[in-house]
Amino acid sequence: MEVALAVGAEASRVSRRILQKIWDPEPINDRDSNEPVWCLGRSYKLAPETPSPVTTATSPVDGAIDAAPAPIATPGTTNRQAIDTPPDSLASSFDSSLAYDNRNQDSGWPPAFLDDFGSRIWMTYRTGFEPIPRSTDPKAASALSFTMRLKTSFGDQTGFSSDTGWGCMIRSGQSLLANALLISQLGRDWRRTTDPGAERNIVALFADDARAPYSLQNFVKHGAIACGKHPGEWFGPSATARCIQALADQHESSLRIYSTGDLPDVYEDSFLATARPDGETFHPTLILVCTRLGIDKINPVYEEALISTLQMEQSIGIAGGRPSSSHYFVGVQRQWLFYLDPHHPRPALQYRENPLNYTLEELDSCHTRRLRYLHVEDMDPSMLIGFLIQDEDDWDMWKSAVKHVQGKSIINVSRHDPARGMGGARAEAIDEVETLSDDDDVDTVLEQ
């Protein structure tokens, strides 16, 4: 019975991939709407602020799609799903870079927004790296999804030379960390269009090799030691946050990590102990907030607050938040969130002793200007939200911003940590309800 279900799921997955190959819409901006679009706290105007004639044109957030025959519908109508990416992130499973070509030159989006979006580091599935040995733990096989067990049964029995089908949350977490490092070291105004090679030292940290501090291999290694995650097993937001914190503590002198564990509570005394360990010098600090904003979908009372996180100056984006898979969300317009999709396999990013030896082609594989977006109502409720606090002023601004969001707040800031020195809540709690990887086309979406 289980085999029959898997075969049926695979057939369904293949047919949907074929459909998406043909139908791969990209959002077009309504030049008359003058709605701002945001990328990690930066706002870009969509049109000059001049009076516009009365028009019935639908805005991009209302679903205008390039060359798409589907009917245009406004958010909240029954046709909204028809103009978004098909269910289960069909585009996310393609072993093709064609889905991320740069077709948005005439899509109406502000060039400055596209330059910003295209300068965000994008970590994806990689193939052909030295195999990560399979765990010898008897529980490891049962921890894998059924689809992954099926794949490994017909593949290399000794290890994983690709993270396709299980590494999407790790890649989303890598993207979040990489962009925090990028902004803290090169500044928020850095763009690939002006200095495309400046990021080499940062990209080198994420090569698919154990010698790279933030490699997939090191995420998997720490996940096995500290989080009970075996190679080939899907990570959740909490496990990903713990790996980021542990690896950064080992290797990073320029960036501190403050993680909230499995609760959305930030404590000022604990944060300042991390950011200002000597009581004087403030170090750039990445805040990682693991949260779950509903059962199987986001509770509407949290939508405005979630959207506002991407509009804050300190935003580093959101990892997770896509049913049956994980994406890296970096932008927003109204209720539509723009994301980078890690589910596009690329050849392994090689380790280079001298980062200057990375070619522009290798750097290009870590970026895209191809836009995709998702309505906030369609997001999975489990996610990892990142904020970069670079100094005291940033800290004060961020505290005020999270306090005065519209709707119900998703982050709580308190002066004192009641659990400080006493141990905190179990960090693995959120991971015990992780979302299934998008290669598991089962209707059950309870994990994360």
From Swiss-Prot:
Protein's UniProt keywords contain Cytoplasm: yes
UniProt-recorded name of the protein: Probable cysteine protease ATG4
InterPro entries: Papain-like_cys_pep_sf, Peptidase_C54, Peptidase_C54_cat
Catalyzed chemical reaction(s): [protein]-C-terminal L-amino acid-glycyl-phosphatidylethanolamide + H2O = [protein]-C-terminal L-amino acid-glycine + a 1,2-diacyl-sn-glycero-3-phosphoethanolamine
Function: Cysteine protease that plays a key role in cytoplasm to vacuole transport (Cvt) and autophagy by mediating both proteolytic activation and delipidation of ATG8. Required for selective autophagic degradation of the nucleus (nucleophagy) as well as for mitophagy which contributes to regulate mitochondrial quantity and quality by eliminating the mitochondria to a basal level to fulfill cellular energy requirements and preventing excess ROS production. The protease activity is required for proteolytic activation of ATG8: cleaves the C-terminal amino acid of ATG8 to reveal a C-terminal glycine.
Taxonomy of the source species: Eukaryota, Fungi, Dikarya, Ascomycota, Pezizomycotina
Any one biological process term the GO annotation gives: protein processing
GO CC annotations on file: nucleus; phagophore assembly site
Protein's cellular compartments: Cytoplasm; Nucleus; Preautophagosomal structure
Low complexity composition bias: residue spans: 69-78
Region (Disordered) residue spans: 69-90
Keyword field: Autophagy, Cytoplasm, Hydrolase, Nucleus, Protease, Protein transport, Thiol protease, Transport
Top-rank taxon, per record: Eukaryota
EC number: 3.4.22.-
GO terms, molecular function: cysteine-type endopeptidase activity; protein-phosphatidylethanolamide deconjugating activity
